[in-house]
C-alpha cells in the first residue's frame, strides 16, 4: 500500500486515500505547520508559491473530473462507486452505462440461439427442401405454393335449423292452403261455388248489378 508524504509536516500518512488526506489537512498540527512555513518566506516568494499551488490545484482538479472514476486517486470522496461491492465499474468513454443485476433477475438472453455448425439453420427452423423435392409432390403443390385447406368437417349447431337452398333449387311446392286463397286481383278462381264462365248463363238476380255492355256481351 502506498503512503502519502506531507511536505509541511514531514511525515508519511498511514493510508493513501482521499479521506485520510482530508482528515490530516484539517488537523491542528498541519494547519500550524503550513502557517509557519509561509510566514518564514518573503512576501513575493510566498505569493508566487501560492499562485503556483492554486494553478496546479485547479488544473489537477479538472483533470481528476475528466478522468474515469476508476483512474482517480483512491476511492471514497472522489470515487464513491469503487467502494460498493459487486459493482463492475464505470464503462469506458462512449459506451452505455451498466448496472449490477438485482437478486432474482435472470441473465440476458441472446436474440438468436447459437447454431451447432457455421452456416447451419437454427434448431427451431426446418431445413430447406432441395430444388427437385416438388417433383413427386401432389399436383398443385410445389415450391412456393401453399397447401390446400382441409375440408370443413365440423357438424352444425344442434340448436340451429338446416340451411335452406336458394330459390329454384329443389324448393318444395307451396302448401294447398295458399292455392285455395283468392287470386291477387280478387277475382274468383275456377271451381269455386258461385262462379261462372262467359259461356255459361248469367245467374238469376245477377243482372241488376251488371253493366249493360257486359250483359250484351253475355247475350242478354
Swiss-Prot record:
Pfam families: zf-U1. SMART domains: ZnF_U1. Residues 88-220 are annotated as: Disordered. It is found in: Nucleus. The keyword Cell inner membrane does not apply. Keywords: Metal-binding, Nucleus, Ribonucleoprotein, RNA-binding, Zinc, Zinc-finger. HAMAP family: U1_C. Belongs to the U1 small nuclear ribonucleoprotein C family. This is U1 small nuclear ribonucleoprotein C. It comes from Cryptococcus neoformans var. neoformans serotype D (strain JEC21 / ATCC MYA-565) (Filobasidiella neoformans). The lineage of its organism: Eukaryota, Fungi, Dikarya, Basidiomycota, Agaricomycotina.
Amino acid at each position: 500500500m502506498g503512503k502519502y508524504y506531507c511536505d509541511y509536516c514531514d511525515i508519511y500518512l498511514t493510508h493513501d486515500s482521499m479521506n485520510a488526506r482530508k482528515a490530516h489537512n484539517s488537523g491542528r498540527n498541519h494547519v500550524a505547520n503550513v502557517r509557519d512555513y509561509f510566514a518564514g518566506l518573503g512576501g513575493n516568494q510566498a505569493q508566487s508559491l501560492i499562485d503556483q499551488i492554486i494553478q496546479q490545484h485547479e488544473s489537477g482538479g479538472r483533470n481528476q473530473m475528466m478522468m474515469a472514476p476508476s483512474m482517480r486517486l483512491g476511492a471514497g470522496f472522489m470515487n464513491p462507486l469503487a467502494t460498493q461491492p459487486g459493482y463492475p465499474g464505470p464503462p469506458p468513454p462512449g459506451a452505455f452505462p451498466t448496472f449490477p443485476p438485482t437478486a432474482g433477475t435472470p441473465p440476458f438472453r441472446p436474440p438468436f440461439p447459437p447454431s451447432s455448425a457455421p452456416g447451419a439453420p437454427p434448431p427451431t427452423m426446418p431445413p430447406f427442401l432441395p430444388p427437385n423435392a416438388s417433383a413427386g409432390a401432389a399436383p398443385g403443390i410445389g415450391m412456393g405454393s401453399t397447401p390446400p385447406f382441409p375440408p370443413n368437417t365440423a357438424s352444425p349447431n344442434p340448436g340451429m335449423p338446416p340451411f335452406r337452398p336458394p330459390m329454384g333449387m329443389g324448393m318444395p311446392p307451396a302448401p294447398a292452403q295458399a292455392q285455395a286463397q283468392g287470386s291477387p286481383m280478387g277475382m274468383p278462381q275456377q271451381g269455386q261455388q258461385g262462379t261462372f264462365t262467359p259461356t255459361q248463363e248469367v245467374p238469376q238476380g245477377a243482372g241488376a248489378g251488371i253493366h249493360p255492355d257486359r250483359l250484351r256481351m253475355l247475350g242478354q
